[in-house]
């Protein structure tokens, strides 16, 4: 069972019968059924033996279910960390990033969220549990299954490429798949000439081995897989494998496509089985809220965790009641915030959801409580329709409450995209919400044109909106409006934008770098 840690869940039930179900599944050796169940009991010694089997290689097809105890805190945090990586991959794929670009973005995040190339049992345990937890989250519909399989398969490819050649061989051998059996050294020697002639071009163009002696040296160490040619029909058509007696000979460096197809096929089958066993978790009122939260696509943006303790502080000395209207600051606002600011400027008022969304955003970028009251009072009273007395009576408390200065003194955080999308859609006279979801294509297209996006770029953004990928649409706009400047972000930083404040933070960071470069250029020119 899960241990309670730092959390107390009300209305706990007796789960002894549930444990019996799990044990019976495991006792009869029904690993397909057991794969779907994470809650189970085992001694620490049994757990060590099991993980010794699970972790024979640094990479896994996740064939066996995890056992043993983890806390609810681990359950949630491990799943969220893995989900961050998968959503980043999904976002990169939707934005047509190249494989090399995705690897550059993802690899550093492994070290922070999901350490992989390590001997640590705890890290491997986290990898294993988080994968199975997310199976429970994303087995519930065909669309969710397809997204999960696509992202996990790409993650598998990146990890495989990070292994050494020795570890790759060890992993393939551990799979014990009929299709993935290496030929003997004797058979390789017998077919050496034909095999080298077939793969020489691939060694040059795929592995950049331009010298003949380099290719021959690599070939001497390379292992080959023999399998029915119909399993690699695409490679056969491109003449990338040697054929003999109905069998194709596949070099180890080309086996990844075969492995990833096998991984994706197995995972999809297991997700369907997981869905069939999902009703067994309906009695567990501790897990369902977490699973429902995760399966909605929820993720905690890096901004939330990194800046959680700074929301009530002035993190940018230049942020005050006047500067938030300035071109320098407002040019970094995402479209949703620009819309709110325009609505406030036009009407000298915002309705409740609009006030909350904008107030907490401004708090997040560093607007202090005193400056916030100054900002809102000036905005509401500027046209003379509202007196200062009415503002203090009807609105002052609410804005102070957002800063934790009234009521229960809760330090509210800025809304992320998930929260914004969960609120009621805006009606006539409302300015809150997400423009990528709530605006018509005509209005959104006109706005994007005013931001100097090309027609092809606008179509790309609208396509993401049509698919319901609103945060991806926003991320595309960020990249298109910042051009290649986004490459100046720190390596390993989250590129997928799922928070208005993250958009602002990234844009402001790039803006300050550009300002610094311009100052240095002026200084250098002045000294010549």
Curated annotation (Swiss-Prot):
UniProt cofactor(s): [4Fe-4S] cluster
GO terms for biological process, alphabetical: DNA replication; DNA replication initiation; DNA replication, synthesis of primer; double-strand break repair
Residue sites binding [4Fe-4S] cluster per the record: 336, 417, 434, 474
Keyword vocabulary terms for this entry: 4Fe-4S, DNA replication, DNA-binding, Iron, Iron-sulfur, Metal-binding, Primosome
Gene Ontology molecular function: any one: metal ion binding
InterPro entries for the chain: DNA_primase_lsu_euk, DNA_primase_lsu_euk/arc
Region (H-T-H-like motif) residue spans: 210-239
Consequence of substituting residue 417 to S: Mild disruption of iron-sulfur-binding. Strong disruption of iron-sulfur-binding, leading to destabilization of the protein and preventing its purification
GO cellular component: alpha DNA polymerase:primase complex; nuclear envelope; nucleus
Cofactor note (record): Binds 1 [4Fe-4S] cluster.
Tree of life domain: Eukaryota
One family name in Pfam for this protein: DNA_primase_lrg
Function: DNA primase is the polymerase that synthesizes small RNA primers for the Okazaki fragments made during discontinuous DNA replication. In a complex with DNA polymerase alpha (DNA polymerase alpha:primase) constitutes a replicative polymerase. Both primase components participate in formation of the active center, but the ATP-binding site is exclusively located on p48.
Subunit structure: DNA polymerase alpha:primase is a four subunit enzyme complex, which is assembled throughout the cell cycle, and consists of the two DNA polymerase subunits A POL1 and B POL12, and the DNA primase large PRI2 and small PRI1 subunits. Interacts with MCM10.
UniProt family annotation: Belongs to the eukaryotic-type primase large subunit family.
Name of the protein this chain belongs to: DNA primase large subunit
Species for this entry: Saccharomyces cerevisiae (strain ATCC 204508 / S288c)
């Amino acid at each position: 069972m899960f241990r309670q840690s730092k959390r107390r869940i009300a209305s706990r039930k007796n789960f002894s019968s549930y444990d019996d179900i799990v044990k019976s599944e495991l006792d009869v050796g029904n690993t397909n059924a057991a794969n779907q169940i994470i809650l189970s009991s085992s001694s620490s010694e049994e757990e060590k033996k099991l993980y010794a089997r699970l972790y024979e290689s640094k990479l896994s097809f996740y064939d066996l279910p995890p056992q043993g105890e983890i806390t609810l805190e681990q359950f949630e945090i491990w799943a969220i960390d893995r989900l961050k990586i998968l959503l980043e991959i999904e976002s990169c794929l939707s934005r047509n990033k190249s494989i090399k670009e995705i690897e550059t973005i993802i690899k550093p995040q492994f070290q922070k969220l999901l350490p992989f190339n390590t001997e640590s049992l705890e890290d491997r345990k986290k990898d294993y549990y988080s994968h199975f937890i997310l199976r429970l989250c994303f087995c519930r519909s065909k669309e969710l299954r397809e997204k999960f399989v696509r992202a996990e398969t790409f993650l598998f490819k990146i990890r495989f490429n990070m292994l050494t050649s020795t570890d790759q061989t060890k992993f393939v051998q551990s799979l014990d798949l009929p299709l993935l059996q290496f030929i003997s050294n004797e058979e390789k020697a017998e077919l050496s000439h034909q095999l080298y002639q077939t793969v020489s071009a691939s060694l040059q163009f795929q592995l950049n081995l331009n010298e003949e002696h380099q290719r021959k040296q690599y070939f001497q160490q390379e292992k080959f897989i023999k399998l029915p040619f119909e399993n690699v029909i695409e490679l056969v058509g491109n003449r990338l494998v040697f054929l003999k007696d109905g069998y194709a000979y596949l070099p180890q460096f080309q086996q990844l496509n075969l492995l990833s197809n096998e991984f994706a096929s197995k995972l999809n089958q297991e997700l369907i089985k997981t869905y069939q066993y999902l009703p067994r978790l309906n009695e567990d009122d501790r897990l369902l809220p977490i699973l429902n939260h995760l399966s909605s696509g929820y993720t905690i943006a890096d901004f939330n965790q990194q800046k959680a303790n700074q929301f009530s502080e002035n993190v940018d000395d230049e942020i005050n009641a006047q500067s938030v209207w300035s071109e320098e600051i407002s040019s970094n606002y995402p479209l949703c915030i620009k819309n709110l600011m325009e609505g406030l400027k036009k009407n000298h008022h915002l309705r409740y959801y609009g006030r909350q969304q904008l107030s907490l955003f401004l708090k997040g970028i560093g607007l202090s409580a005193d400056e916030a009251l100054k900002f809102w009072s000036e905005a509401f009273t500027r046209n003379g329709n509202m007196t200062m007395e009415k503002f203090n009576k009807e609105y002052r408390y609410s804005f102070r409450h957002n800063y934790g200065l009234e009521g229960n003194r809760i330090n509210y955080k800025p809304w992320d995209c998930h929260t914004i999308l969960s609120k009621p859609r805006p009606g006539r006279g409302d300015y809150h919400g997400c423009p990528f979801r709530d605006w018509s294509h005509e209005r959104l297209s006109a706005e994007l044109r005013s931001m100097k996006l090309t027609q092809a770029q606008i179509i790309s953004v609208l396509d993401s909106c049509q698919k319901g990928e609103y945060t991806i649409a926003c991320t595309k706009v960020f990249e298109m409006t910042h051009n290649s400047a986004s490459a100046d972000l720190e390596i390993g930083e989250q590129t997928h934008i799922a928070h208005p404040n993250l958009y602002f933070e990234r844009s402001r960071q790039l803006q300050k770098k550009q300002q610094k470069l311009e100052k240095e250029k002026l200084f250098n020119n002045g000294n010549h």
